[in-house]
């Protein structure tokens, strides 16, 4: 868990997302580090030091005018220093009813974990669980 650029996002959304996600993962983690002032790559360092097979980082995203509390999730197979963004899967705008729901985000996280384990990779090599999934019109913010 990392506050990233929005501690408010972590405060509001991390626990509900964990509650929705952990039951979907066959062997959930036994250690959840909490990092202040972190950026996405911190998961590579932590995962490498812990000899983790995979990391799932929940991090506060850069606040926008309409979403000061958006949570992001980054999933990386075989974390180590030097991983690139192309080697991670990102799920963004996790905000309950105002963005991606906890349930949908949890299912996407579980999908990416299962696929990463099956294929021994993450990032652009993995496909989205449902490429047709979009937010309802009422949840979209028109430009």
Regions found by a protein language model. Name each.
Residues 1-9, 56-58:
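Short glycine-rich or small-residue beta-strand-to-loop segments that form or flank ligand, phosphate
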Residues 7-10, 38-44, 64-67:
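Short, well-ordered, mixed-charge alpha-helical segments that flank or form enzyme active sites
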Residues 7-28:
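Glycine-rich phosphate/diphosphate-binding loop of Rossmann-like nucleotide-binding domains
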Residues 14-19, 49, 72-76:
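Short, solvent-exposed amphipathic alpha-helical segments in soluble enzyme
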Residues 22-50:
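Active-site rim loops that border cofactor/substrate pockets in soluble metabolic enzymes
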Residues 30-33, 53-57, 73, 88-90:
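Structural motif
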Residues 44-72:
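Glycine-rich phosphate-binding loop
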Residues 61-143:
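C-terminal functional extensions of proteins
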């Amino acid at each position: 868990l990392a506050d990233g650029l929005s501690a408010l996002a972590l405060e509001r959304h991390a626990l509900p997302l964990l509650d929705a996600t952990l039951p979907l993962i066959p062997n959930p983690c036994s250690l959840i580090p909490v990092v202040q002032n972190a950026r996405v790559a911190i998961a590579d360092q932590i995962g490498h030091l812990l000899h983790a097979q995979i990391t799932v980082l929940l991090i506060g995203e850069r606040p926008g005018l309409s979403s000061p509390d958006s949570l992001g999730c980054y999933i990386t197979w075989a974390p180590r220093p030097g991983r690139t963004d192309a080697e991670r899967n990102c799920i963004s705008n996790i905000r309950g009813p105002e963005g991606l729901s906890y349930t949908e985000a949890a299912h996407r996280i579980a999908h990416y974990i299962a696929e990463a384990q099956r294929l021994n990779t993450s990032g652009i090599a993995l496909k989205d669980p449902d490429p047709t999934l979009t937010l309802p019109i009422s949840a979209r913010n028109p430009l």
